[in-house]
Amino acid sequence: MRLYREVPLEELSGMADAERFRHVPERRVSYQIDRNVNYTNVCLSACKFCNFHCRPDQPEKAYTLDFEDYLPKIAEMKALGGDQLLLQGGLHPKYGIDWYETLFRRLKEAEPSLKLNALGPPEIAHIARVSKLSYRDVLVRLRAAGLDTLPGAGAEILVDRVRKFLSPAKPTAQQWLDVMGEAHRLGMSTTATMVYGHIETLEERINHLLALRALQDCRPAGTPGFRAFICWPMQLTGTELLRLADAGRLPAGITLPGEPAWQADPSCRWRPDEEFLRTVAIARLVLDNVDHIQASWLTVGLDTGARALHVGADDMGSIMIEENVVSAAGARHLLQEGERTLRTAIEAAGFTPWLRDQCYQPR
């Protein structure tokens, strides 16, 4: 906690940068070309920070993509040099294992070279509940249908005090970790995430990182576990959470950054860019058993994302051909010129860009 709270950013950056070069010795920074496709916006979880979802009782707002909708999206992605769909959606009350197996198989039949980085622990837990299966059985069947890797979606902060208020219908912290543990025991490659800057404390951020580190220590020998960690600040614009705060209707003990309970905390004196950089740096230091740290530039902008390459990050993520969920809550940093813009930012930061696949191998 002292490092996070008190150490000057320049000193913290130097420590994290040294750790980065221990994991990735070369002065190179990876990136990926993929497409984020949200297959449905129907969701039971009703997260207080999400502007994208609609409730099952809102048919006028609901959508689910038809299979034919995927084909032009895949074609456009391939034309831009991409090879992977980041496929995510809501916790749809009617979609069990059969629906996902059918979708995955049809996608792989239509485009055999396509990589599916799909769903996340909340969806896996939801499918298990709907289909009355174990987490392991769901993962085994989805892998057989075409699932390649499992994103770290839905982690937010792995502390149940936070989760019960923000997203009470989502899996608990332990359930999220249990899904990932099963994926790791199956030898799957996954990622881990953290969304900060809402009702959590700095201590809870550290506890989140420690929980990830402990799970990574438990992965079977020779398996990747978490290949990468990604963090970003929550986008509050227009969310139910911000509306509750503005109306003075947050429960006792629940505060947002900048409110009275935070004023004694050094983080409320950090500029948003410094808070992001400090969080990336502390993640690099805590997660010494995770190979890669990604600079999630979508919510902080490309300039700040590139600065993160000097505080422990070694990957710039995707060019983001399509993104809906975070953008619906206020993020507006999608690239207009795609790969060239991202490569230029990496080079300007003093690194050599290289295009990777989902397993951090050159393409």
Language model segments and positions:
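Hydrophobic faces of well-ordered beta-strands that scaffold small-molecule active sites
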Residues: 29-35, 85, 116-120, 150-152, ...
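Glycine-rich, proline-tolerant flexible connector loops at the mouths of alpha/beta enzymes
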Residues: 4-5, 31-37, 58, 86-98, ...
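Auxiliary Fe-S-binding modules of radical SAM enzymes
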Residues: 1-10, 78, 210, 217-363
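Mobile, glycine- and charge-enriched loop segments
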Residues: 28-29, 44, 50-54, 59, ...
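Flexible, acidic/Gly-rich N-terminal and inter-domain linker regions that tether
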Residues: 1-46, 354-363
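Short loop/turn motifs at secondary-structure junctions
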Residues: 46, 81-83, 146-149, 187-189, ...
